[in-house]
């Protein structure tokens, strides 16, 4: 008898969900926040297990669940297993926070289930010579834009690093203002846009790796500044791109070498990040063992649980306005007070860093709540961050959080499906969103797709596709049909 491991794994996943449901029922009867915490942890474990049943389409869900645990659940979990209790906040604060995360995870799962089972029976035809030629032209133009704008990307990061060398991290965060001409900023934004379009044309592994490597190397400067998130997100972005390409080109993109780099590099990176937690503040790690440093790193990432807790405690103190929306704030501000708003007479904010203006006049949740909680420390460069969960809950309540999470789950599946098709623009948009998506549990909801409404993005997209069209028309009879560069 041959054991069907796929079926066994499915039964393990089902059993995990059954345990989660029983724990949830137990919580209804005993009303214990410890039972609720264990229910939440089991729900995350079950959700992660479910992702591996169809990992080809659930890789985005998987990484998102992991970041939810890391940013929003790890701290109270570690507190409980180390101390046997959780008592930093009142019970109702923990209850709200755990339930909010549970509601979002259930919504994400339902969203994935609604769309992942629907297979697109319409098969894409083979690429015609014209299609291959056009994609090759897009590839060349987008690569040229990337290479032209990359030096400006580095220059702006180096300017930040030079400023940071002479001040503390928090002074840098509160006071830094670029002295470079504005056009350098505009050109630097094209790096990510052009990179995503270039990668969406599905170049070969060598050329893709070079471009991704340049992107990661650039973000090493962010790491030296003390800002870890861009560097970590660039690594996650590179991994998920390799994963998606490997699904249609099995064994080419992720082989023994790549797996070894991941299994060895991931723990080392976490230890380095843990060390940087202290180095950024000018402190040492003392006599911490490797395991203690590893656990400390995870614990410190869980500070975003405090956003849920403080959001619940201080929600009534948030600025009251005639119209207020945190969930879509970046888009609304771009239209009313950003580059687009300025064209129609809007007045931009005078400060881009922590300030009373952003704390009281903007609809940026992280700034509003940080000022309420920290006061003068916020103005000195400190902050508690934000979370898409608190933005949605503050604007729309638990029902809104649930419904928007369903839409997110649907969106995750749509994005991953775009990776397995030949639509360059759609895949490019997916890559742009993925570049910042996994920071959402400790950032804003709109941040990952905000660029899609900017003039810079659609301007450079138009330039790339228009130039590619001209090139295609000029050389369509002589170009190599393979379209490689």
Range-by-range predicted roles:
Residues 43-48, 189-202, 403-417:
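Hydrophobic, aromatic-rich transmembrane alpha-helices
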């Amino acid at each position: 008898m041959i054991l069907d491991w796929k079926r066994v794994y499915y039964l393990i996943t089902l059993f995990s969900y059954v345990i989660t449901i029983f724990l949830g029922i137990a919580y209804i009867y005993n009303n214990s926040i410890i039972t609720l915490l264990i229910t939440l942890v089991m729900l995350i474990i079950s959700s992660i297990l479910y992702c591996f049943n169809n990992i080809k389409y659930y890789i985005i869900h998987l990484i998102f669940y992991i970041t939810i645990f890391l940013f929003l659940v790890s701290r109270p979990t570690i507190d409980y297993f180390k101390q046997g209790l959780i008592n930093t906040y009142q019970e109702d604060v923990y209850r709200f926070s755990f339930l909010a995360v549970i509601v979002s995870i259930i919504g994400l799962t339902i969203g994935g289930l609604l769309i992942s089972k629907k297979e697109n029976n319409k098969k894409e035809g083979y690429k015609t010579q014209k299609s291959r030629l056009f994609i090759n032209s897009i590839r060349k133009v987008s690569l040229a834009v990337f290479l032209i704008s990359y030096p400006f990307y580095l220059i702006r990061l180096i300017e930040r690093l030079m400023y940071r060398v002479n001040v503390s991290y928090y002074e840098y965060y509160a006071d830094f203002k670029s002295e470079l001409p504005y056009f350098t900023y505009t050109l630097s934004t094209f790096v990510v846009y052009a990179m995503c379009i270039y990668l969406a044309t599905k170049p070969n592994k060598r050329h893709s790796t070079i471009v991704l490597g340049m992107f990661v190397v650039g973000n090493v400067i962010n790491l030296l500044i003390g800002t870890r998130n861009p560097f970590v997100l660039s690594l996650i972005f590179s991994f998920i791109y390799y994963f998606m390409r490997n699904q249609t080109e099995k064994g080419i993109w992720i082989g023994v070498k790549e797996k070894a780099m991941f299994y060895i590099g991931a723990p080392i990176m976490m230890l380095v990040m843990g060390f940087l937690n202290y180095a950024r503040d000018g402190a040492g790690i003392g006599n911490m063992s490797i395991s203690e440093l590893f656990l400390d790193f995870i614990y410190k990432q869980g500070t975003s649980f405090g956003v849920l807790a403080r959001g619940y405690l201080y929600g009534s103190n948030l600025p009251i306005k005639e119209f207020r929306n945190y969930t879509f704030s970046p888009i609304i501000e771009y239209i009313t007070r950003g580059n687009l708003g300025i064209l129609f007479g809007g007045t931009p904010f005078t400060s881009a860093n922590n300030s009373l203006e952003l704390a009281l006049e903007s609809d940026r949740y992280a700034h509003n709540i940080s000022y309420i909680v920290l006061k003068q420390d916020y103005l000195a460069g400190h902050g508690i961050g934000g979370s898409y969960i608190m933005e949605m809950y503050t604007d729309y309540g638990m029902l809104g959080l649930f419904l928007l999470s369903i839409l997110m789950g649907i969106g995750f599946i749509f994005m991953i499906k775009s990776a397995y098709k030949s639509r360059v623009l759609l895949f490019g948009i997916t890559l742009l969103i993925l570049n910042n998506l996994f920071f959402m549990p400790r950032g804003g909801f709109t941040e990952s797709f905000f660029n899609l409404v900017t003039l810079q993005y659609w301007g450079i997209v138009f330039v790339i596709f228009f130039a590619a069209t001209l090139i295609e028309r000029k050389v369509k009879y002589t170009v190599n049909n393979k379209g490689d560069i």
